[in-house]
Amino acid sequence: MRQALGMIETRGLVALFEATDAMLKAASVTFAGWEPAGSGLVTAFVEGDVAAVKAATDAGAEAAARVGEVVSVQVISRPHDDLAAYVDKTTGRASTVAAGAAKEKKR
């Protein structure tokens, strides 16, 4: 995993697409996937340097708020390596199976 993980959770896909587009245009970050949380909530993940991820999530939250509802924005600096297993880059979706496997590995 890179130096930081950024997440934006919105209500609805339109706001999430706006957020993701703005994040990728605002800073040198990599799209790491997305995950539906249920009840219309969806979360996008980006990775990169701490400053770039912070700038990207700020821009993404602002863009999403113009067209919908931003539920949460979070930047994790230097996330634990096991967290990388949660994001499945082959599908572009967060992998709950991989997250469960990482959790079991620690036991």
Where are the regions a protein language model picked out?
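Long, contiguous binding/interaction regions
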Residues: 1-40, 47-107
